[in-house]
Curated annotation (Swiss-Prot):
Short name of one Pfam family: HLH
Role noted for this protein: Transcription factor with important role in somitogenesis. Defines the rostrocaudal patterning of the somite by participating in distinct Notch pathways. Also regulates the FGF signaling pathway. Specifies the rostral half of the somites. Generates rostro-caudal polarity of somites by down-regulating in the presumptive rostral domain DLL1, a Notch ligand. Participates in the segment border formation by activating in the anterior presomitic mesoderm LFNG, a negative regulator of DLL1-Notch signaling. Acts as a strong suppressor of Notch activity.
Main subcellular localisation: nucleus
The bHLH domain, residue ranges: 81-135
Organism whose genome encodes this protein: Homo sapiens
GO molecular function, one term: protein dimerization activity
Region annotated Disordered, chain positions: 28-92, 152-208, 222-295, 351-376
Record's protein name: Mesoderm posterior protein 2
Compositional bias ranges of the Gly residues kind: 180-206
Disease connection: Spondylocostal dysostosis 2, autosomal recessive: A condition of variable severity associated with vertebral and rib segmentation defects. The main skeletal malformations include fusion of vertebrae, hemivertebrae, fusion of certain ribs, and other rib malformations. Deformity of the chest and spine (severe scoliosis, kyphoscoliosis and lordosis) is a natural consequence of the malformation and leads to a dwarf-like appearance.
Gene: MESP2
Record field: compositional bias (Basic and acidic residues): 235-244
Length: 397
């Protein structure tokens, strides 16, 4: 029988089989072909399949050990976190307590807690209690004083107040003071509003009588310009003696004649003085106001020149301002000598007892006393223009 080639030849021919190391080294001592055939009949795949079979139990054991150790680690993790969080909370609490005690020590006086002295927590709390008791006794907030206050007040204590104060006194007093201040502020606001309303109403009610109030003063002066002539006194048709003194300027359109009195009554004559070149007239004071003597306004040079240029007739007498009257024997009309001014007068001058030379003119003099004269219309002495039907009086500027 032919012997099987040595294993070296097999290794040379089939090097790819043994290169993987599949366990053929145990069959190198076999000399029988059957054994070789048996050995060759056994496929290396079977050996490969049989060898890894013991490995799964080892892997499973390792996985079981790892699974057994993993829950232990997971169980120990939360316990350590809880211990750490508890310690952190304790540290935070101690820090907060130390901060609060340090803040409390700041309010203690140096006599109780000197600056360089270290105090424990218990000592700090005891000193604070003593200091608070001392302040309560000084301020009258002791238990005895509070009981006396409660007895005095009884059940009438107000529910409002400071919750920290036992008697709720300071807060209640402050609340009452605020309520009083608000009430006073509202009363003042209402009083101011009423005062403004009353002031406006009085101003509107007294506005029509403003001219009369101004004219009732001791002296007055006419303004520089006016839109037109104002009305004459209310009692025009009664008589000259009852009328209030009032003044009219000379050169004003729609002007009315001043009040005149008879020649015989000199004491009751009113003073009629033309103001300083005012183109409008002032209304006389109302009858309800008492007459007040007026101060004659100074006549200007222009008015003096105008009055000097006027010629008069001897029959009626017209007194303007305080001029000296020089009558003329012949009846003449008033003719202006100043250009731009036109005078037309239907009244006549009343002659005095003594006639003087012709060419008489008005002379303005501030120092001369006022003379009384009356303006007589044809046949009707001491009457106003409105009471006469045939008389005409027109002054144009």
């Amino acid at each position: 029988m032919a012997q099987s080639p040595p294993p070296q030849s097999l290794l040379g021919h089939d090097h790819w089989i043994f290169a993987q190391g599949w366990g053929w080294a145990g069959h190198w001592d076999s000399t029988s072909p059957a054994s070789s055939s048996d050995s060759s009949g056994s496929c290396p795949c079977d050996g490969a399949r049989g060898l890894p079979q013991p490995q799964p139990p080892s892997c499973s054991s390792r996985a079981a050990e790892a699974a057994a150790t993993t829950p232990r680690r997971a169980r120990t993790g939360p316990a350590g976190g809880q211990r750490q969080s508890a310690s952190e909370r304790e540290k935070l609490r101690m820090r907060t307590l130390a901060r609060a005690l340090h803040e409390l020590r700041r309010f203690l006086p140096p006599s109780l807690a000197p600056a360089g002295q270290s105090l424990t927590k218990i000592e700090t709390l005891r000193l604070a209690i003593r200091y608070i008791g001392h302040l309560s006794a000084v301020l009258g907030l002791s238990e005895e004083s509070l009981q006396c206050r409660r007895r005095q007040r009884g059940d009438a204590g107000s529910p409002w107040g400071c919750p920290l104060c036992p008697d709720r006194g300071p807060a209640e007093a402050q609340t009452q003071a605020e309520g009083q201040g608000q009430g006073q502020g509202q009363g003042q606001g209402q009083g101011q509003g009423q005062g403004q309303g009353q002031g406006q109403g009085q101003g509107q009610g007294r506005r029509p009588g403003l001219v009369s109030a101004v004219l009732a003063e001791a002296s007055w002066g006419s303004p520089s310009a006016c839109p037109g002539a104002q009305a004459a006194p209310e009692r025009l048709g009664r008589g000259v003696h009852d009328t209030d003194p009032w003044a009219t300027p000379p050169y004003c359109p729609k002007i009315q004649s001043p009040p005149y009195s008879s020649q015989g009554t000199t004491s009751d004559a009113s003073l009629w003085t033309p103001p300083q070149g005012c183109p409008w007239t002032q209304s006389s004071p109302e009858p309800r106001n008492p007459p007040v003597p007026w101060t004659a306004a100074p006549a200007t040079l222009e008015l003096a020149a105008v009055y000097q240029g006027l010629s008069v007739s001897p029959e009626p007498c017209l007194s303007l301002g305080a001029p000296s009257l020089l009558p003329h024997p012949s009846c003449q009309r008033l003719q202006p000598q100043t250009p731009g001014r036109c005078w037309s007068h239907s009244a006549e001058v009343v002659p005095n007892s003594e006639d003087q030379g012709p060419g008489a003119a008005f002379q303005l003099s501030e120092a001369s006393p006022p003379q009384s004269s009356g303006l007589r219309f044809s046949g009707c002495p001491e009457l106003w223009q409105e009471d006469l039907e045939g008389a005409r009086l027109g002054i144009f500027y």
